[in-house]
Amino acid sequence: MNEIIRAIEAEQIRTDLPKFAIGDTIKVYVKIQEGNKERVQMFEGTVIKKQNGGLRETFTVRRVAYGTGVERTFPMNAPIIDKIEIARKGKVRRAKLYYLRDRVGKSAKVKELLTR
């Protein structure tokens, strides 16, 4: 039974999205339906968690807009996601960055991973 479920899920998983990690700053382009028009809106922020795996995988992006923290959770394989761009790689030592919720200003930043 599990093999059948895995085979069906493997067909439906999106392969056009880049691989990103927790701590990365990403731009998520989301399709929004307003009346009869459809447009694309960008949501940029730091990935604070990734959950599950396979078809049910979700990730949460956090940003601070006008002094207020905004978190948005996206299903990885959702059709509303147009594309994802990685703005910068972050260097973190945790799987969940919930501690960023309590921080303000420069202390809420994630160190950038320098690649050579």
Curated annotation (Swiss-Prot):
TM ranges: none
Alphabetized PROSITE patterns for the sequence: RIBOSOMAL_L19
SUPFAM superfamilies, per the entry: Translation proteins SH3-like domain
Chloroplast in keyword set: no
GO cellular component: cytosolic large ribosomal subunit
Record's keyword terms, sorted: Ribonucleoprotein, Ribosomal protein
Highest taxon above the source species: Bacteria
GO MF: structural constituent of ribosome
Any one of the GO BP annotations: translation
Keyword Transcription attributed: no
Protein name as annotated: Large ribosomal subunit protein bL19
Task of the protein: This protein is located at the 30S-50S ribosomal subunit interface and may play a role in the structure and function of the aminoacyl-tRNA binding site.
Family the entry assigns: Belongs to the bacterial ribosomal protein bL19 family.
